[in-house]
C-alpha cells in the first residue's frame, strides 16, 4: 500500500513538498482554503497530484501517514485539532524533506541577520568548492531543491 501525505497549503512550501513527495512514490493530496493558482493546478494535474481549493475536506485526509502544514497556516485552527485527534503526525516541510535527503543541513535562525548570514555562508561554501543550495525564505523551498 502506498503511503499518503496531505499537504495543507499550495504555496511555495506546499508546492515543493507535493512534487517531492510524488517523486518519492507518495499518494499526494493538497488542500488549500484559498484559491490555487492556475499554473499550480495544471502542474498538479500533470503529475497526478490530487488537490482541492477553497476548503479543507477532513474525510479526504483520513488515512494519511503525514500532514505537512505550510508555515502560513495557524496551528490553532479546528482542522489541526481534528487531525491531531486522529493521530495523524503533523510535519513541517523541513522535517518531511530532511527524511528524503542525505545532504548536510545548516539551519540559520534568529531575530536579525538571517538573510545576510545565510547568503554569506552560501558564498563561502560555494567559493570553497562545495555543492551547496540556498533555500527557505531565500531562493527555492527546501523540498523543491531536493
Where is each model-derived feature located?
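N-terminal leader/targeting and accessory segments in enzymes
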Residues: 1-92, 96
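Phosphate-binding loop of NTP-binding sites
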Residues: 20-23, 58-62, 71-146
Amino acid at each position: 500500500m502506498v503511503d499518503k501525505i496531505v499537504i495543507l497549503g499550495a504555496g511555495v512550501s506546499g508546492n515543493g513538498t507535493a512534487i517531492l513527495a510524488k517523486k518519492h512514490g507518495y499518494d499526494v493530496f493538497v488542500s488549500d482554503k484559498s484559491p490555487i493558482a492556475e499554473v499550480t493546478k495544471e502542474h498538479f494535474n500533470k503529475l497526478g497530484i490530487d488537490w482541492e481549493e477553497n476548503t479543507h475536506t477532513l474525510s479526504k485526509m483520513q488515512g494519511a501517514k503525514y500532514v505537512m502544514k505550510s508555515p502560513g497556516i495557524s496551528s490553532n485552527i479546528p482542522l489541526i485539532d481534528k487531525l491531531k485527534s486522529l493521530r495523524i503526525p503533523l510535519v513541517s516541510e523541513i522535517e518531511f524533506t530532511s527524511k528524503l535527503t542525505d545532504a548536510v543541513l545548516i539551519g540559520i535562525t534568529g531575530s536579525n541577520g538571517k538573510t545576510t548570514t545565510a547568503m554569506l555562508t552560501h558564498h563561502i561554501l560555494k567559493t570553497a568548492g562545495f555543492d551547496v543550495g540556498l533555500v527557505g525564505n531565500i531562493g527555492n523551498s527546501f523540498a523543491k531543491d531536493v
